[in-house]
C-alpha cells in the first residue's frame, strides 16, 4: 500500500509527522510512504532515523497552506504546496491514500476538487470514530457541510453504515439522528425532513432521534447530523472529557493522604480511562464520499496520533471500504 503524507500538515509538523511515519513503517511492513514538503527540511528530519530507504519517497513541495488562508483560493494559488502535491499523488494513481494534519478547509476542499466525489454522492462527510461508554461510535458529519439538505444526511448514514460494518465487523449497525428531543416532530425543518427520509430508508437500521446527552453512551453506532451540529457535538465532547479528567487531577492534589493512596491503587484504571478518551489513540477521521482514501489527522497531532492516522488509512484500505461505497451508490444510479 502506498500512502501520501502531507509532511507539513499540522501544528507539530514536520517533526511529529516524520516521527509518526517512521513508527508506522516499523508497525506495518506492507506500506510505502510518499512524504510531501520542502525536500531539504524533510531530509533533515528523516536523517534522525534508521529505516528502509526504499520505503520512504520524499516529494518536494516548497509551499505550505496555513489554516488562516482561504481554502479554495490557497489551493489554486499554491499548486506546489504539500497538501496539493499529496492529493495529486492519489489523483494520479501513484498512491492509494492520503493523510494530512494541515488546514482542514484546504484538505477537504482539495479532496473534493482534486480527487473528486464518488458518483452519486451529493456531499462528502467527515466521520471521526469516538469513544463511548459501551463502545465506539462515529459522527457523520463534523464540519465538512455546515448547511445540508435532508438527502445529504441519508447518504451520510449509508456511508457510515458501510464504514462501520467493514471496520468493526458489525452486521447491522444502529443509526441515530442528533436532535434536541426523541420525538419525531422535534427539531428544525432539516431534522424533521431528514427523520422522515431516514425512517423510510429500508437499507439502514434507524433508531430515531438521539439527544446530545445520549451521545457519550456509545449505544448508537452511527450518529448523523449537519456539519455545524456535528462539529459542535464533537468539540463539546472532547472538551468535556478533558475537563473531567482535569477536575479529577485537581481534586487528587487537594485530597488527603488516605485519598491519595486510594488514587494510587486506582492509577491503572484512571490511566485506561484517560487512554480511552485520548484522540491520539483513534488517529484521523475518514472523509467519506470522495473517490479516494482521505484521512484528516487532528491539527495538534503528535507522533503517536500521526502513526494511528496511518493505521486508520490502512484499515480503510484493507477492508475495501472505498470499493463498497462506490458499489453502493453506483447501484442507485
From Swiss-Prot:
The protein's annotated pathway: Lipid metabolism; phospholipid metabolism
Gene Ontology biological process terms, A to Z: fatty acid biosynthetic process; phospholipid biosynthetic process
Protein localization: Cytoplasm
EC number annotated for this UniProt entry: 2.3.1.274
Alphabetical keyword list: Cytoplasm, Lipid biosynthesis, Lipid metabolism, Phospholipid biosynthesis, Phospholipid metabolism, Transferase
InterPro entries cross-referenced by the UniProt entry: FA_synthesis (IPR003664), Phospholipid_synth_PlsX-like (IPR012281)
Main location, first listed in the record: cytoplasm
Catalytic activity, as annotated: a fatty acyl-[ACP] + phosphate = an acyl phosphate + holo-[ACP]
GO CC field: cytoplasm
Catalytic class of the enzyme: transferase
GO molecular function: phosphate:acyl-[acyl carrier protein] acyltransferase activity
Homology family: Belongs to the PlsX family.
Subunit-level organization: Homodimer. Probably interacts with PlsY.
Function text: Catalyzes the reversible formation of acyl-phosphate (acyl-PO(4)) from acyl-[acyl-carrier-protein] (acyl-ACP). This enzyme utilizes acyl-ACP as fatty acyl donor, but not acyl-CoA.
Protein name: Phosphate acyltransferase
Protein's organism: Clostridium beijerinckii (strain ATCC 51743 / NCIMB 8052) (Clostridium acetobutylicum)
Lineage: Bacteria, Bacillati, Bacillota, Clostridia, Eubacteriales
Amino acid at each position: 500500500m502506498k500512502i501520501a503524507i502531507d509532511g507539513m500538515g499540522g501544528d507539530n509538523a514536520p517533526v511529529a509527522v516524520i516521527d509518526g511515519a517512521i513508527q508506522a513503517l516499523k508497525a506495518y511492513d506492507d506500506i510505502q510512504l510518499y512524504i510531501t514538503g520542502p525536500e531539504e527540511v524533510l531530509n533533515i528530519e528523516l536523517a534522525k532515523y534508521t529505516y528502509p530507504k526504499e520505503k520512504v519517497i520524499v516529494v518536494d513541495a516548497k509551499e505550505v497552506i496555513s489554516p488562516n488562508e482561504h481554502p479554495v483560493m490557497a489551493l489554486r494559488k499554491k499548486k506546489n504546496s504539500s497538501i496539493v502535491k499529496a492529493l495529486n499523488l492519489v489523483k494520479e494513481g501513484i498512491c492509494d491514500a492520503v493523510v494530512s494534519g494541515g488546514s482542514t478547509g484546504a484538505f477537504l476542499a482539495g479532496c473534493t476538487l482534486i480527487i473528486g466525489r464518488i458518483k452519486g454522492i451529493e456531499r462528502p462527510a467527515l466521520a471521526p470514530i469516538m469513544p463511548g461508554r459501551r463502545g465506539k461510535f462515529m459522527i457523520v458529519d463534523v464540519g465538512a457541510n455546515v448547511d445540508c439538505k435532508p438527502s445529504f444526511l441519508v447518504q451520510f448514514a449509508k456511508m457510515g453504515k458501510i464504514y462501520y460494518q467493514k471496520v468493526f465487523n458489525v452486521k447491522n449497525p444502529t443509526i441515530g439522528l442528533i436532535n434536541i428531543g426523541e420525538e419525531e416532530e422535534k427539531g428544525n425543518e432539516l431534522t424533521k425532513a431528514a427523520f422522515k427520509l431516514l425512517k423510510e430508508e429500508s437499507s439502514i437500521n434507524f433508531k430515531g432521534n438521539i439527544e446530545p446527552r445520549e451521545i457519550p453512551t456509545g449505544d448508537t453506532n452511527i450518529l448523523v447530523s449537519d456539519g455545524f451540529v456535528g462539529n459542535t457535538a464533537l468539540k463539546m465532547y472532547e472538551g468535556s472529557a478533558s475537563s473531567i479528567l482535569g477536575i479529577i487531577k485537581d481534586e487528587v492534589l487537594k485530597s488527603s493522604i488516605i485519598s491519595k493512596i486510594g488514587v494510587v491503587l486506582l492509577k491503572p484504571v484512571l490511566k485506561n480511562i484517560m487512554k480511552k478518551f485520548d484522540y491520539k489513540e483513534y488517529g484521523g477521521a475518514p472523509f467519506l464520499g470522495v473517490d479516494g482514501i482521505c484521512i484528516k489527522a487532528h491539527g495538534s497531532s503528535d507522533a503517536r496520533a500521526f502513526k494511528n492516522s496511518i493505521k486508520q488509512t490502512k484499515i480503510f484500505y484493507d477492508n475495501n471500504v472505498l470499493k463498497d461505497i462506490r458499489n453502493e451508490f453506483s447501484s442507485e444510479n
